[in-house]
């Protein structure tokens, strides 16, 4: 396990903690969890940071999509942006999906969002029912 290698471009400003002493885990939790409080939004009961990518725009270096359960436990998706990957500005308004297929924009369920950069575009997906 002493020969770990991160694949991808260098992210020198990415927050990082060394592996805890004695740990043999491939991945480990940040010692100051949770990064985002459960009441980060005016309507949130809980917030889950499912997907974050490097994103250079204005002052921001990171962007993410977050599952934010409201106080009625409805799962909604919200966009957020961060300078340092620790302190987040999460948008109050729900994230809207758009695409060439009208079905993409239909709201079903805000669960487990993911984001990826492919080429020069960012793609977001979440729970999607299959046939």
Label every model-predicted segment.
Residues 48-50, 62, 80:
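Structural detector for hydrophobic anchor residues on beta-strands
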Residues 78-84:
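Beta-propeller blade signature
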Residues 66-69:
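Short beta-strand segments enriched in hydrophobic/aromatic residues
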Residues 72-75:
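Short, solvent-exposed loop/turn segments at conserved positions within beta-propeller repeat blades
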Residues 2-54, 86-117:
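Surface loop/turn signatures of beta-propeller and other carbohydrate-active proteins
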Residues 128-131:
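Conserved small/polar residues in nucleotide/adenosyl-binding loops
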Residues 59-63, 121-124:
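Entry beta-strands of beta-propeller and related beta-repeat scaffolds
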